[in-house]
């Protein structure tokens, strides 16, 4: 499972005057939140159980399909992405690397796959949305309180480590990996 999320650096109206990440950050658009932003975009690779296994950080104006190439070496087999990963050249590159990229198609595209398969894709894709939602709400991964890229990547790595530790504790206790409510109640 692969998806991206925005990381705001400054409010869009203040971005031209912002000195933080000048020359590194960019302007982008997040379709799921229907907002334009100035900052970075995080790209997360999650395994089937919901445990993050890969992450890359790009300027917001970099296409998420281009950022996915940074994580291609750790992907094998089936890869589920959202509609933002639809591009024939990208799909061919994935096929050449032994990766079967499956995405939901746009409304104006013909889908030859069985409807039951598409429903399974959509149901499994919710898992990465859940993980990104947890990282955003419980770990505030979308907030930038840093002034340089090293500290930002370090901060994000710590948050991903905390998420993975919570998943590990749940697996050790015989629970679903991304159900953190029971960990909070037990503390």
Predicted regions, residues:
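Polybasic low-complexity intrinsically disordered regions
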Residues: 1-106
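Short, solvent-exposed polar/charged micro-motifs at secondary-structure junctions
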Residues: 8-14, 112-114, 155
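Hydrophobic (often cysteine-bearing) scaffold residues that line and stabilize catalytic clefts
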Residues: 64, 124, 153, 157
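Helix-centered, glycine/charged polyanion-binding patches within enzymatic domains
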Residues: 78, 83-151
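C-terminal domain-tail junction helix/linker
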Residues: 154-187
